[in-house]
Amino acid sequence: MTILPAIDLKDGKAVRLSKGLMESAKIYSDEPWQVAKRFEELGSEWVHLVDLNGAFAGKPENLEQIKKIRENCNLKLELGGGIRDEETIKMYLDLGIDRLILGSIAVKDPKFVREMAAKYPIVVGIDAIDGMVAVEGWGEVSDMKATDLAKEFADAGVEAIICTDVGRDGMMTGVNIDFTLAIKEASGLETIASGGLKDMTDINALIEAGIDGTIVGKAFYEGTLDLEEAFRTVNAG
């Protein structure tokens, strides 16, 4: 299983939200690149970046910080938030981002996502509230089931699906393993769990369930998960 520590960018700072609410943002660092460097030192291969301002604005908003992270770290970077066109995808890949996460656009224009996945390293982000897909920075809930959206991309050439249970995001109440497995089953793709992870109990449960990867956010920042121990456990498997 792959562990992807997360950095959420808001107004140039590293923050965490609770349940996706912008007003709940808690600042953890004024220098996000230093956080990424720390993840690298702890043994991470990947960092999961989210441009929160971009997710709401529909265009890149934290470019300087993203550049700084790329310049200062040798990690693989995946990035989501505000990516709505091919020009933005190319720009980020030219910057050295390894793969890009398409979320809201996957609901609104699945054909576009298929076209992009045929050309570029693309991950689909499926965010759900009570099993229904949430879009536009989680500000709106669609009438589409998350599992139906996952099926849509089964043969589209995307690298993975990141599925977030919005109700658990930043709450450290445990990962929704059943939801993650349902997405994996529907798509047949590598599936990464996001939202709710708290400690090693969750890491072990995810490994046991055969989940491919997990995003680690608040559990690291609040100190409930020892990331080094988590990497050791995963690598021992």
From Swiss-Prot:
InterPro entries: Aldolase_TIM (IPR013785), His_biosynth (IPR006062), HisA_bact_arch (IPR006063), Isoase_HisA-like (IPR044524), Isoase_HisA-like_bact (IPR023016), RibuloseP-bd_barrel (IPR011060)
GO cellular component, one term: cytoplasm
Active-site residues, as the UniProt record annotates them: 8, 127
Protein name in the entry: 1-(5-phosphoribosyl)-5-[(5-phosphoribosylamino)methylideneamino] imidazole-4-carboxamide isomerase
Location in the cell: Cytoplasm
Record pathway: Amino-acid biosynthesis; L-histidine biosynthesis; L-histidine from 5-phospho-alpha-D-ribose 1-diphosphate: step 4/9
Coiled coil (UniProt feature): none
Pfam family, one: His_biosynth
This enzyme's EC code(s): 5.3.1.16
Organism, scientific name: Sulfurovum sp. (strain NBC37-1)
Annotated keywords: Amino-acid biosynthesis, Cytoplasm, Histidine biosynthesis, Isomerase
GO terms of molecular function: 1-(5-phosphoribosyl)-5-[(5-phosphoribosylamino)methylideneamino]imidazole-4-carboxamide isomerase activity
